[in-house]
Every structure is written in structure tokens, then in C-alpha cells.
Amino acid sequence: MKNMKKIIGSLFFLAISICSCNSQPSNIQTPTDTLPIHIQRFDKALLAYIETQDTTLEKELLKEYPAMLDIVGKGILNLQSPEVSGFFDQVIAYYSEPTLKNLYKDAVREYDHVTDIENQLGKGFTFLKANFPNMQIPACYMHVSGFNQNVLAADSLLSLSIDKYMGEAYPLYQDFFYDYQRIKMQRTLAAADYLAGWLMSEYPFEGNENILLDRMIYEGKIKYIVHLALPEITPAQLMGYQEKDYEWCVSNELTLWNTIIQRKHLYTPDQITTSKYLDDKPCTFLSDETPGNIGTWIGWQIVSLSLIHI
């Protein structure tokens, strides 16, 4: 670790300046009370409509879930406003595809009860609110996307695509996802992804997306904060690593830094190279053993080490 400190000593000032912005608490607050969080089950309501095709439910959906219909329509189905004629016909057509419909029913069955996730979100958002007093706590929902993006965020709204969290052994995943992707598709990471999605929505990336150091510190800061909010999730789990892969990173941290610096990847504005460091795919361009998303892991180490010195 002493060698590591020497190598990245020149990075401390930049890391600290980024991590000390208004979005990062300078003094960590540990609240004792917990905010109650209730997840609104848009997923169940929409499935009831899809299965019955009862047009009277359309008005109920428009009344109860107007924002969710809008964001799911635009973000997943590429549809315009729910008020437009034919909107619900296209929703039914999309979700009636046999494989997707079975996936939808499996997901709703798996997430019939979500008290465990609500409790985690309560603790997590309580921590965020204590340390980010101006942060708005969103209304939380669940939906099924058909393997689209994990989290949808809009003004005061946050929704998780539960079909992406069925457990790495879920049969359908075997045909669509690699091992390194499936390890993240677990219920135990649902709350963490809710929080990460909201942090990214509230505090979007403002650096140069082509510069590796900018991206590493931003992604590392998100992991750092989520881990503080949900400490029961291990760093390996939060990274989507096997324990052996996480231990490899710790043991080879100095070597990783030497390689990155020697190749001049840290500051060079190169979108292709930078994206490789943040891809879930194993980073074999560094070594055969390097796990994916190594840029985020290194960023997390920079943030953690830098804040110790503030």
C-alpha cells in the first residue's frame, strides 16, 4: 500500500477536488432512524392488464401510473405519450411475445413480496438524505423491461427492471448473458442498483467521458457512496466479482497501476480504450486474470484513499 500511495500521490489533489464537490459529504452522518420506503407495483398492475386485456384497466393505469407509463413507453417501447391512440395496443403486442410474457410472469412471481428490498432502500435512502440534505427521495417502482436497462429514473421517480434480477442460475439467462453478467443479476443487488441509479440521476457525470481518470473517479465515487449506504453488501458483490477475482485485484493493485501509467491510458482522451476499462467483460487487454470493470474498482480505491487524507 505504501508503494501504491507513492504512485498515485500526484493524483490525490485531482481526486480530492472531484470528491469534495457539493455532491459528496465531507463528514459522514450515520442516521439512527429509517425512512419508510414503499415500492409501488406498476409491474403487477401492468401484467394484470396484459393478461386480461380489459380496456377498463387502461383508465386505472393512466390514473395511478401516468409517469411510469410515459417513461416505460418512451424508454423501452419507443412510444409516444400514453394518451396517443394505439398506445395500449402496442404495449400488449410487445409484452405478449411468448418468451417475454413467461419472463414477466416469472419475475412478478419471484418478486411477489419485496419487504426485504424496501427495508434496504429505507436504510439506504436514509443514509443518502442524511449526507445529501438537498436530495429528493424518489417514488420507487418496479417494472419489467424485457432485458433492457436495469434502472429507469425521471423527475422524482425511480424504477427497477426486476426481470434483470432473477438470480444468476435463472434458466433464460443462460441463453442471453455471459457468466460475468449473470453474477450481477441477483436480488441481493437490487437495492444497490436503485441507489446507484438515483445517485447518477441526481449527480450526472460532468467530466470528459473519453478520459479514463475522470470516468474512474466518477464511477468509483458512486460505488463508494453506495457501499457506505449499504455496508452489508460486500465490495466483491457490489463489483459483481467472485471473491477470488476481488482478491486478485487487491493483490495486483500496484501492477495494475504500473501498467495503466506505462501505457499512458490515464489522461489520454481515447473513448475506445476508456470504455474497455468500464466494460463488464474481463479486461484481458491488461492481463488474462483481470476482471471486468476494473476502471470502476480502481476509481473506488482512489476515492477511498483520497478521502482518508482529507
Task: Map each language-model feature to its residues.
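Positively charged n-region of N-terminal signal peptides that target proteins for export
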Residues: M1-I7
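Sec-dependent N-terminal signal peptides
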Residues: I7-I16
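C-terminal motif of bacterial Sec signal peptides marking the signal peptidase cleavage site
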Residues: I18-S20
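N-terminal mature-domain "stem" immediately C-terminal to a signal peptide or N-terminal signal-anchor/transmembrane
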Residues: N22-D89
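Residues that form generic nucleotide/phosphate-binding pockets
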Residues: A45, E60-E64, I71, G75, ...
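An amphipathic alpha-helical core segment
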Residues: Y49-E60, D193, G197-E202, M216-L305
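Acidic/His-rich structured neighborhood in mature extracellular/periplasmic domains
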Residues: Q90-Y246
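Conserved small/polar residues in nucleotide/adenosyl-binding loops
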Residues: I308-I310
